[in-house]
Design a protein with these regions (language model features):
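Structural and coupling elements of P-loop NTPases
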Residues: 1-526
Length: 526
């Protein structure tokens, strides 16, 4: 029977992040295909293959062809247990993605070869840098026309502020794309497009082998040798330690849609990516190999099964062994829970599990007991760090349009806020509920889900606000004076913390100048 240490060593828990339409969900599908978790991949946003993408769960995702919630999937690959967190790709869904990055040990970033580094990728990379998360980059869509691979490497370094080292290299791109030379394994993989089936590799292990010319032609063979010479002269050798410290990103090239370059990425990933890492709590650092179980809730998902109004709390196991029906303490309330039906996920399929190990994500049925950031332990009081709320970018008042469905609306808003879809503030001046999101699409998602999952109808009333700032002060009198002066702009969040709603940058700066005793924060963690 495998020991705790053995189970930890074989686990790889990571997120795939990208700008919308870079091919992230497609890459996830193909990784599942190689893991034997699915046998046919569903082409995203295409009717050519009738199966809908495995990791897109919610009805609105299926309609729009974008992922709007974080999906969790696990599968075995060789000796390894892989846990993938597929994050929302749409630019409006940063908040859920920020939180997901607190539950993973490494990240794969997908970049479109035609578009290079985009805004969302930069923002997510900042969160990775805050936590020194190891990053691998997959440059996708090589079968389409795009930019020169060396230009892409330069942009990755300058925009993401991280060193890069190619571990595979494309032979031409677009219509002339012939394949990829795998630098890490010293093999040549020739391109044969296939959207559904796993490709066999065609291997040529030595670049001086005349079969290289036979495979790709004299011109491309000469260019490949020249490029590889340039790479070894310009880029540092791959240093695994630098990668694990979050300072160096290995880069792979391929076409996820055509299942090309994906296996090379996966084979290298399982070898170099970190197994579960220590987690920082306020009290101390928790190491995965500790005997006592601990874990935290990083996401709550309502109505994963439209037939049942159920919630699932996603718990990341940080240390020890999680066991079904064992008593675990919820640190926030001091209550003890025995979880009778914990689940593991393969996209839509949920299986009841008897045990889980560090790095695993366990689904816990929730009837309203759990909140994002909750800690479960075998008794020790631990508070894990790194689940802040950030100031939303857009704000709207939510109005009930059907007074007969007030209860349903209240319940729906509460559950959606528990999921972290958006943030809710209560305006202290007029008592109205204010919803804050990272972008416009989230308002549409909330409205759609309230109607289809709770039978409640709402409308939105826009309000022009610049930022929501959490405020605090060591001087109680100064805090009261500020709240009195700014009473029209004061709100509380769901935890009852004071929030100042600044309607412009100028108003915020004036408030900071006029009230030096008040500290203003753009994140709830201070």
């Amino acid at each position: 029977m495998a020991s705790l240490t053995d189970e930890i060593k074989r686990r790889r828990t990571f997120a795939i992040i990208s700008h919308p339409d870079a091919g992230k969900t497609t890459l996830t599908e193909k990784l599942l295909l190689f893991g034997g978790a699915i046998h046919v991949a569903g082409a995203v946003k295409s009717n050519k293959i009738k199966k809908t993408a495995t990791s897109d769960w919610m009805e609105i995702e299926k309609q729009r062809g974008i992922s709007v919630a974080t999906s969790v999937m696990g599968f075995d690959y060789g000796d390894y247990k892989i846990n993938i967190l597929d994050t929302p790709g749409h630019q409006d869904f940063a908040e859920d993605t920020y939180r997901t990055l607190t539950a993973v040990d490494s990240v794969i970033i997908v970049v479109d070869v035609a578009k290079g580094v985009e805004q969302q990728t930069r923002k997510l990379m900042e969160v990775c840098r805050m936590r020194n998360t190891p990053v691998i980059i997959f440059v996708n869509k090589l079968d389409r026309e795009g930019r020169d691979p060396f230009d892409i490497l330069d942009e990755l370094e300058s925009e993401l502020k991280i060193g890069v080292r190619p571990l595979s290299w494309p032979i031409n791109i677009g219509a002339k794309f012939k394949g990829v030379y795998n630098i890490y394994e010293n093999s040549l993989d020739l391109f044969k497009p296939d959207k559904q089936k796993v490709q066999e590799r065609v291997e040529i292990t030595d670049l001086s082998d005349p079969r290289v010319e036979e495979a790709v032609g004299e011109t491309d063979a000469a260019k490949l040798r020249e490029d590889l010479e340039l790479i070894s002269g310009v880029y540092p050798d791959f240093d695994e330690e630098e990668y694990l410290r979050g300072k160096l990103a290995p880069v792979f090239f391929g076409s996820a849609l055509n299942t090309f370059g994906v296996k090379e990425l996966l084979d290298c990933f399982v070898k170099i990516a970190p197994s579960p890492r220590p987690t920082q709590a306020d009290e101390r650092e928790i190491r995965p190999e500790e005997e006592a179980f601990s874990g935290f809730v990083f996401k709550i998902h309502a109505n994963m099964d439209p037939n049942h109004r159920s919630c699932i709390a996603f718990v990341k196991v940080c240390s020890g062994k999680f066991e079904r029906n064992a008593p675990y303490k919820q640190v926030r309330t001091d209550k003890v829970f025995r979880i009778a039906a914990p689940t593991a996920f393969m996209a839509q399929r949920k299986n009841v599990v008897d045990e889980a190990y560090p790095g695993d994500i366990v689904g816990v049925p929730d009837t309203g007991n759990f909140k994002i950031g909750d800690t479960l332990t075998q008794g020790e009081s631990l508070h894990f760090r790194g689940l802040p709320s950030f100031s939303p970018e857009m704000f709207k008042y939510i109005e009930n349009t059907d007074p007969m469905k007030s209860k349903q609306l209240e319940k729906g808003i509460r559950q959606l806020m528990d999921e972290g879809v958006a943030q809710m503030f209560i305006n202290q001046f007029n008592g109205r509920k204010l919803i804050g999101t990272v972008g416009q699409l989230q308002f549409e998602v909330i409205q759609y889900r309230l109607l289809h999952e709770y039978g409640a109808q709402c409308r939105w009333e826009p309000i022009s606000l610049y930022k929501a700032c959490w405020i605090e002060s060591d001087d109680a009198a100064a805090l009261e004076a500020f709240k009195k002066r700014k009473h029209q702009f004061m709100a509380v969040d769901r935890e009852g913390r004071d929030v100042f709603l600044a309607d412009s940058n100028y108003v915020l700066q004036m408030a900071q100048n006029d009230f030096p005793a008040i500290r203003f924060h753009f994140s709830s963690e201070f």
